[in-house]
Each structure stands twice: as structure tokens, then as C-alpha cells.
Amino acid sequence: MNHIVLGLIQGLTEFLPISSSGHLTLFSYLFNIEPNISNFAFLHLATLAAIIVFVWKEIVEILKGLFTLKKEYYSLVLKIIISTIPAAIFGFLFNSTIENSFSNLKIISFFFLVTAASLFVSDKLKGKKDFFNISYIDALIIGLFQMIAIFPGISRSGITLFGALTVGLEREKALKYSFLMGIPVILGAGILETSKIELNSYILISGLVAFLSGLLSLLILKKLTISKKLKIFSYYCILIAIIAFFVG
């Protein structure tokens, strides 16, 4: 049952901007399950499959653009790569620091508050840019936001959506770009960590639950992003921050 709960938490919190890693760590503590970074990474791979389904149209469009040698699509891929670099470098250089943060609920509590603030401000931001209109500097800025999302308590979807809106992307485009740029990072981290674990029926069930609940949460996030109702999650993150602070 605990593995089903963790899979459900991962799927719902990975895309809803409330930090899946922060919730997994907190609930592992509450349910007396020893935090396992490798198992968490495997669940991230399960939700990665949900991302691919969600942005499948954009992925196909990009691939067609590359095969037909359209310059703007090569430029878009380069921007996505640029957005990926900061998190990759930071994760490689400070891997031990990142892993240690998973055991400190006080730190996680602070990061939940960072997520809450970014979501509250996001509802007030407006943008008109498409994928092809952002600059390489814009892509780097969004990537820097993704970099700090490595820490538990900071929502990757929430903070990168905030970054994309900050540089002027239209709301739905900002959401889609957030997930497109997340694919390489989640895939890399997942492969790196899952090589350390042995697959069993429990973790596979967790992965399936994470995938299905992830698809549901993506649809919810899309609707709330467009309707500018992300502050709902901001209030929730403040509540979780308080709980994590006193539990820790």
C-alpha cells in the first residue's frame, strides 16, 4: 500500500506545482519509509512518460521541423539544450549537497515557501511570446530557474513556469516549454540513479500509478495555468511548509 501511495503522490505532485520530491521526502518521514533517492528517480521516469504523452504534438512537430531542415526548429532545440545545461552542471557538481537536502525537513520547508511565492507572482504575469520568439538569453534564464528546482520543496513545473512567464512566454506556451526542457533533465537523472536499484513488482506498481496520476495532474495544471488560478497551490505550499517545519 505504501508503494501505491508514493506512486500517487509522485504522479500528482510532479506536475501540480507543489514539489514531488518535497512531498515524497515528507511522506516517507511520516509513513516511516526510508527515503530512497534511486526509487524516487525511477518514479520520475514513470512521470516522464506522462510528459511525453502530454507534449507529444510538440515533439512530433519539432522532429518534422528538424527533418525538413527548418532553421527555427534547430534554433528551438538549441534553446531547449541551453535551458538544460545549468541544471545538468549544478547536479553534477553538487550531487552530495543535493542528496543531503533530502534529509532536512527545515530546508525543505523553506523551499516550499519559495515555490509558494513564485506561484503567487505567476498569476500576475502576462506574455505573448511563442517558442520561436524567445532569445537564447531567455532560454538560459529559464534554465537557471530549473537549476534550483533540483532541491526538494521547489517545484520544477512551478519554478520553470514562473521563469518562462518572466521572460514573456504566453501562458500555455510557457507550460509546454517547461515540460519540453524538463525531458532531458528528468531522463538523465532517472537513468543515473535507477542503475543502482533492483526492479520489483512494488516499484513497478508505483511507477504505473505515478504515470496515470501524472496524466491527470497535467490536465489539471494546464487548465489552472491558463485561467490564472495557480495561487491555489501557493496557499497549499505554505501549509505544507508549516507542516514540514514542525515535523522536522
Curated annotation (Swiss-Prot):
Q: List the disulfide bonds.
A: none
Q: Where in the cell is it found?
A: Cell inner membrane
Instruction: Report the sequence similarity comment from the record.
Output: Belongs to the UppP family.
The way this protein sits in the membrane is described as: Multi-pass membrane protein
Q: Which Pfam families does this one have?
A: BacA
Q: Name one GO molecular function term.
A: undecaprenyl-diphosphatase activity
Question: What keywords tag this UniProt record?
Answer: Antibiotic resistance, Cell inner membrane, Cell membrane, Cell shape, Cell wall biogenesis/degradation, Hydrolase, Membrane, Peptidoglycan synthesis, Transmembrane, Transmembrane helix
Sorted alphabetically, which InterPro entries does this protein's record hold? Na:dicarbo_symporter_sf, UppP
Q: Which reaction does it catalyse?
A: di-trans,octa-cis-undecaprenyl diphosphate + H2O = di-trans,octa-cis-undecaprenyl phosphate + phosphate + H(+)
Gene coding for it: uppP
EC assignment: the record states 3.6.1.27
Q: What is this protein called?
A: Undecaprenyl-diphosphatase
What more is known? Bacitracin is thought to be involved in the inhibition of peptidoglycan synthesis by sequestering undecaprenyl diphosphate, thereby reducing the pool of lipid carrier available.
Question: What job does the chain carry out?
Answer: Catalyzes the dephosphorylation of undecaprenyl diphosphate (UPP). Confers resistance to bacitracin.
TM helices/strands, residue ranges? 4-24, 40-60, 74-94, 101-121, 134-154, 174-194, 201-221, 228-248
**Taxonomic lineage of this organism?**
Bacteria, Thermotogati, Thermotogota, Thermotogae, Thermotogales
Q: Which GO terms describe its cellular component?
A: plasma membrane
